[in-house]
């Protein structure tokens, strides 16, 4: 409640009951204007919420705002739709009585958005249970689906609901949403085939064309082009709207269908129906020379038959002929061009209308509470949301506007019954005077009365045989209703009014104002007939949805179906029964301007809506007796602090407490009255003075409460700290004493175990010496850890105790192995290769040949011949695949005369090659090499043994070089003959051609000498080297 006077002057009052001049419509509208200018779009009339469409996003619908309104009293915070929703929810929880929220207002006033905000609030604040998350999501996602198929852009609203919707949300005994149910009313099917200029067809057509996947559109026979290419989408000349994203809308609808539980096949069938309507619109007719009607667009007919799952020839015949059944006989007659076009449009409207009904039924199956029969559980309650068309007055008003405005009359009657009438009854119950108000029952009777009402006359004219027409219907209305105060026609009007009424129009004086209705099309729209031949075609459809919408039973039923107006009247009657069984809350929506512009307030337009919504009547009835009324308990609870006798608590009965309070506040007798259970305050200024006094008193109370609270808090804090200190002290002293005693016991046990273990240290391990032995082991291991060798050459090692000698040896070996492994991991690749060769040399020559120990420190080189020392022709002969890996200068001795010859020995990847300058003298493949022989002395001789069977070879090869250990090692590695190296002690035998053998004798001497001895052997004398 606005308490500060400056705030009230700036933003107005948040409850119209508090207006000083409550009879002034100008004051009412000015209060709306002030609040709208400050971004305050909600205002109360008692328990009725008035909402003004801001035409922009406001930061008042966040989750934080939802939490602010959860469980808060209706009048404790500023007006908000969340407050009204929470009030209904709490009444449902506490009183276990079904609730309903009625949202009304003209098209574009924000009814659909209001219902969505209420639904979002419930899905956020309600408790959860195992399966409620799915229900919440489906409840929310049902809105975009219904909007896509049931909403359209009109001149006044870019997202106008073209059908009425009533949704029940079912809650369990804990208040969690467990199900839902939707009722739909009077879908504007005529929009499928015709739209006024500046309006569009239903959203789904544009969303499919703009956002549908290429593959889907191809299957449906649609082009992702301008909607102007489709006859049913060009009537309004408004294919695209800047405020609507059809592409994003398709994504939202497609996702919502999946969440709700539609199968892919169902979505495909549904889109096929949507596409079939577009193809129907593009189906054109012509007349031949004989005047017979035929279809001129065969391609459209082919797509139609595929999408609807019917035979093409049968469909073609049904669109150009009609079947009449008379006295059991069937007759088929051709349709004129005009009749064929009308039948096509009726066909499209019937398909779309029944598909929409199927869609709502599918949503209901998805939202149904599976564990219990709907409405049957005693442990569940419902909140109903009514979002239905607002009062409509266009330049051209037809049958649809007549039904919509009739619906609004019924809702106004319900509002009168549940609100204004109940208000009057409250006054009478409290003993106040009766207040008069307008009751629109006379208008409802004018429309719906049996035999005399407009609907009854319309039905009678539709059933009359002969030349019944819209004009004869108008004449019948004039004859029957000519004297009614709320009915006027051109013929009945006086000269001044007659100019405003057409000859084919009649005027109804609604509660909201006067509306002229053009009778053209009333009979056809009321009949809403579909030729039997077309019904038969659809009954044979293989489309999953069409087959469910059109049953063969319809063809067997000979009764005339109820007219559209009668169906609507009956469904409205059922809706009224549902709403009357629930406790209502009201949201009255107002459109501030026709341009959908934020911040613009059109006073003339707002005044018209305030009038036809009956807001001033509602306010006058509430204020006729008293502006403010509250129960004794609520009034005393709020204002008891203003009187010392009632503060802080009143222990007597409530009426006496309120009387004591108002006496202290100096209320005058004419300013208030005490009823049986409530206090009534007549003037808003009395309440404002009381509110201002409460604001001032709050400051005093706040200071007192702060002072008392601080004193209490400090005393409590002191006692808490003192008690904590004492507890900590006593606890800590006990801990210290126990810890000290435990430490002494452990020390004594340790000393005792140590002494006993030392005495038995040389005995086998037992409980008496295990502590000492563990200590010795630990000490030794720590000593080893501190004195580990840093390199392989470090031979130091701590001396172990006798019991750990074996373990010490194992650890020492492991340590050395780790050092070696670590050393090996750090070796560079070239050094690794060097060591590998040295290891091979060691395995061959160590302890076998003189001079080996001197060769160990000397590194093996990669080659003893540089690249330029090898003749280029030799390299070319060897080729690129046979690269030289090692080369060394050698002396080759002839096999017969042992004449020395200078040669080069080249080791390649596959063979050993002996070269004389530019000529290859001999090539020995490694695979053919039988072995290698060297002497045990320090000479440089070695013999390569070759198979004697090889005709290309002349025998074994006797060679001598300065680095025999290096050369033989490399040759053995490359030829893989490591185990085929023979070290001879005295002589080496080698093969000569034709099975002969040669011998080399080795003797030790002071100098190196090589001669041929008398016995034909090669004698080699070499000094001994250690």
Swiss-Prot record:
GO terms for molecular function: actin filament binding; ATP binding; microfilament motor activity. Residues 849-1024 form the TH1 domain. Transmembrane segments: none annotated. Residues 12-695 form the Myosin motor domain. Pfam families: IQ, Myosin_head, Myosin_TH1. GO terms for cellular component: actin cytoskeleton; cell cortex; cytoplasm; cytoplasmic vesicle; microvillus; myosin complex; plasma membrane; ruffle membrane. It comes from the Eukaryota. Keywords: Acetylation, Actin-binding, ATP-binding, Cell membrane, Cell projection, Cytoplasm, Cytoplasmic vesicle, Membrane, Methylation, Motor protein, Myosin, Nucleotide-binding, Repeat. The modification N6-methyllysine is found at residue 349. Residues 572-594 are annotated as: Actin-binding. The keyword Coiled coil does not apply. SUPFAM superfamilies: P-loop containing nucleoside triphosphate hydrolases. The keyword RNA-binding does not apply. The modification N-acetylmethionine is found at residue 1. Residues 698-727, 721-750 form the IQ domain. GO terms for biological process: actin filament organization; actin filament-based movement; endocytosis; glomerulus development. Interacts (via its IQ motifs) with calm. Myosins are actin-based motor molecules with ATPase activity. Unconventional myosins serve in intracellular movements. Their highly divergent tails are presumed to bind to membranous compartments, which would be moved relative to actin filaments. PANTHER family: MYOSIN, UNCONVENTIONAL MYOSIN-IC. Belongs to the TRAFAC class myosin-kinesin ATPase superfamily. Myosin family. This is Unconventional myosin-Ic. It comes from Danio rerio (Zebrafish). The gene is myo1c.
């Amino acid at each position: 409640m606005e308490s500060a006077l400056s705030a009230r002057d700036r933003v107005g009052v948040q409850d119209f009951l508090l207006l000083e001049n409550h009879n002034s419509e100008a004051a009412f509208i000015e209060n709306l204007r002030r609040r709208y200018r400050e971004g305050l779009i909600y205002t109360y009339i008692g328990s009725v919420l008035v909402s003004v469409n801001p035409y922009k996003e406001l930061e008042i619908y966040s989750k934080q705002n939802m939490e602010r309104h959860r469980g808060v009293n209706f009048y404790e915070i500023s007006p908000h739709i969340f407050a009204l929703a929470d009030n209904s929810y709490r009444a449902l929880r506490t009183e276990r009585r079904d609730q309903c929220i009625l949202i009304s207002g003209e098209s574009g006033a924000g009814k659909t958005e209001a219902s969505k905000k209420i639904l979002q609030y419930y899905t956020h604040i309600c408790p959860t249970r195992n399966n409620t998350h799915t229900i919440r999501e489906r409840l929310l996602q049902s809105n975009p689906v219904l909007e896509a198929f049931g909403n359209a852009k009109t001149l006044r609203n870019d997202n106008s609901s073209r059908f009425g919707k009533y949704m029940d949300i079912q809650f369990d005994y804990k208040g969690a949403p467990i199900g839902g149910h939707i009722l739909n009313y009077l879908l504007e099917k005529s929009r499928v085939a015709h739209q006024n200029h500046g309006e569009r067809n239903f959203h789904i057509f544009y969303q499919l064309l703009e956002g549908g996947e290429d593959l889907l559109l191809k299957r449906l026979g649609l082009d992702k082009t301008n909607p102007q290419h489709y006859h049913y989408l060009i009537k309004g000349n408004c294919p695209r709207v800047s405020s609507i994203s059809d592409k994003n809308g398709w994504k939202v609808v497609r996702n919502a269908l999946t969440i709700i539980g539609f199968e892919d096949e169902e979505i495909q069938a549904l889109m096929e129906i949507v596409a079939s309507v577009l193809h129907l619109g593009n189906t054109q007719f012509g007349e031949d020379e004989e005047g017979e009607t035929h279809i001129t667009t065969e391609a459209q007919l082919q797509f139609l038959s595929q999408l609807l799952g019917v035979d093409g020839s049968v469909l073609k015949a049904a669109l150009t002929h009609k079947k009449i059944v008379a006295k059991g006989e069937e007759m088929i007659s051709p349709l004129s061009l005009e009749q064929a076009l009308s039948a096509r449009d009726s066909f499209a409207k019937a398909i779309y209308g029944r598909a929409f009904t199927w869609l709502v039924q599918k949503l209901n199956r998805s939202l149904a509470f599976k564990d219990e029969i709907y409405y049957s559980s005693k442990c569940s309650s419902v909140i109903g949301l009514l979002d239905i068309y607002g009062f409509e007055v266009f330049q051209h008003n037809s049958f649809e506007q007549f039904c919509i405005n009739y619906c609004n009359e019924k809702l106004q009657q319900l509002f009168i019954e549940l609100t204004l009438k109940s208000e009057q009854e409250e006054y009478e119950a409290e003993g106040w005077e009766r207040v008069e108000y307008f009751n629109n029952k006379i208008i409802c009777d004018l429309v719906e009365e049996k035999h005399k009402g407009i609907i009854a006359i319309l039905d009678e004219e539709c059933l009359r045989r002969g030349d019944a027409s819209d004009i004869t219907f108008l004449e019948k209305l004039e004859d029957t209703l000519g004297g009614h105060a709320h009915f006027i026609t051109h013929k009945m009007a006086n000269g001044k009014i007659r100019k405003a009424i057409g000859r084919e129009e009649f005027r109804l004086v609604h509660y909201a104002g006067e509306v002229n209705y053009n009778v053209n099309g009333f009979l056809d729209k009321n009949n809403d007939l579909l030729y039997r031949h077309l019904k038969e075609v659809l009954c044979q459809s293989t489309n999953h949805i069409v087959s469910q919408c059109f049953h063969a039973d319809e063809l067997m039923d000979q009764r005339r179906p109820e007219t559209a107006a009668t169906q609507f009247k009956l469904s409205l009657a059922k809706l009224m029964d549902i709403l009357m069984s629930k406790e209502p809350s009201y949201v009255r929506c107002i459109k501030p301007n026709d341009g959908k512009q934020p911040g613009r307030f059109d006073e003339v337009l707002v005044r018209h809506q305030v009038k036809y919504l009956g807001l001033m009547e509602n306010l006058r009835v509430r204020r006729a007796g008293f502006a403010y009324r509250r129960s004794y308990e609520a009034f005393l609870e709020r204002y008891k602090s203003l009187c010392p006798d009632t503060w802080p608590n009143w222990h007597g009965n409530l009426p006496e407490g309120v009387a004591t309070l108002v006496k202290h506040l100096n209320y005058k007798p004419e300013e208030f009255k005490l009823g049986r259970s409530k206090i009534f305050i007549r003037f808003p200024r009395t309440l404002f003075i009381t509110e201002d006094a409460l604001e001032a008193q709050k400051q005093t109370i706040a200071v007192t409460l702060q002072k008392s609270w601080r004193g209490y808090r400090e005393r409590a804090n002191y006692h808490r700290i003192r008690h904590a200190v004492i507890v900590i002290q006593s606890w800590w002293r006990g801990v210290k004493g126990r810890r000290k005693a435990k430490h002494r016991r452990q020390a004594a046990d340790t000393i005792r175990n140590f002494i006993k273990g030392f005495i038995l240290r040389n005995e086998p391990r037992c409980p008496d010496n295990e502590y000492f032995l563990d200590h010795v082991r630990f000490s030794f291991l720590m000593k080893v850890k501190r004195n580990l060798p840093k390199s392989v050459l470090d031979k130091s090692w701590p001396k172990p105790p006798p019991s750990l000698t074996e373990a010490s040896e194992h650890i020492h070996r492991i340590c050395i192995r780790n050092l070696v492994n670590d050393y090996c991991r750090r070796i560079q690749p070239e050094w690794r290769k060097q060591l590998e060769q040295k290891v091979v040399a060691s395995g061959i020559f160590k302890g076998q040949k003189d001079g080996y120990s001197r060769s160990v420190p000397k590194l093996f080189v990669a080659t003893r011949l540089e690249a330029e020392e090898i003749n280029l022709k030799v390299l070319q002969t060897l080729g690129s695949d046979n690269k030289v890996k090692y080369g060394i200068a050698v002396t080759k001795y002839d096999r017969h005369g042992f004449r020395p010859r200078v040669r080069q020995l080249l080791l390649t990847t596959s063979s050993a090659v002996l070269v004389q300058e530019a000529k290859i003298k001999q090539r020995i493949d490694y695979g053919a090499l039988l072995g290698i022989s060297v002497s045990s002395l320090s000479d440089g001789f070695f013999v390569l043994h070759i198979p004697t069977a090889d005709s290309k070879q002349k025998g074994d090869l006797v060679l001598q070089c300065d680095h025999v250990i290096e050369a033989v090692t490399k040759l053995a590695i490359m030829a893989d003959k490591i185990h085929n190296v023979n070290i001879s002690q005295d002589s080496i035998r080698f093969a000569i051609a034709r099975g002969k053998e040669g011998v080399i004798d080795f003797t030790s001497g002071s100098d190196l000498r090589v001669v041929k001895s008398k016995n034909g052997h090669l004698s080699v004398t070499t000094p001994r080297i250690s």
